Amino acid sequence: MAKGDSFLSTPEKTPTGEEKRHLRIIITNADVELNYVVVSVTTLYHRNIQDCSCILQKSDHNFIKHKSIVDFKRTKIMSSVEIANGILKGLLIPKDSVRDDVLQRIIEAAKKSRYISTEIKTMLV
């Protein structure tokens, strides 16, 4: 996996109670311990409640079907082993990489996000 690559998460419960897979995007190169920063994309439902600091359109990635946001509250560090094993076991589903311009927009918004921990922000250099 590499910076800009994407995959679908394991099924997760949505606020409506149904289970859906969310698009995850790797936004860093691997660090010395082979860990990546991974963000989650979700449909924009409530502009006044959700963090709209990084809105994505259908044209930004072929998996996105509706106006969506990068949900920085769900940003996490994932190891290369965790991602590779998830893909091998069919838990994670690889998708197309994001375009460079979209990736840069996500990274810039992540650097400013109040929802991302200092630990994770240090990896965004």
How would you label these PLM feature ranges?
Residues 4-5:
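Loop/turn positions that initiate beta-strands
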Residues 12, 41, 75-77:
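Beta-hairpin (beta-strand-turn-beta-strand) motif
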Residues 15-62:
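Compact nucleic-acid interaction/catalytic patches
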Residues 60-125:
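C-terminal terminal-subdomain/extension
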